[in-house]
């Protein structure tokens, strides 16, 4: 079962990567970009067949390793099969 984990900096946490991307976009002539937040996407292919258990497992993985929960939030999405 495919599970997607989106990890993003929490609101109010400095995001230097997002700021650098925003600056680069402006340098390239793109206008109207008010803010950029940069995170990561992790796609897991789990052997689990029960969507609820797959979600629970991915959430535990995110809390323990995939996200630094002090400064990052995460969202888990189980792919419909």
Task: List where the protein language model places each region.
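Short glycine-/aliphatic-rich beta-strand segments at the starts of folded cytosolic domains
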Residues: 1-11, 40-44
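Solvent-exposed beta-strand sheet faces enriched in polar/charged residues
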Residues: 6, 36, 45, 77-79
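Short amphipathic alpha-helix segments
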Residues: 12-28
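Short, conserved charged micro-motifs
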Residues: 13-16, 49-56
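Conserved functional loop/turn residues at catalytic and ligand-binding sites
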Residues: 29, 45, 69
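N-terminal glycine-rich anion-binding loops that anchor highly charged ligand groups
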Residues: 30-37
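C-terminal structural segments of small proteins and small subunits
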Residues: 52-81
């Amino acid at each position: 079962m495919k599970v997607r984990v989106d990890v993003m900096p929490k609101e109010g946490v400095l995001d230097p990567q997002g700021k650098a991307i925003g600056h680069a976009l402006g340098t390239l002539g793109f206008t109207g970009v008010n803010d950029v937040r940069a995170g990561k996407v992790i796609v897991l292919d789990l052997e689990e067949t029960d969507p609820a258990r797959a979600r629970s497992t991915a959430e535990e993985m995110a809390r323990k390793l995939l996200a630094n929960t002090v400064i990052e939030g995460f969202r888990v999405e189980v792919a419909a099969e």
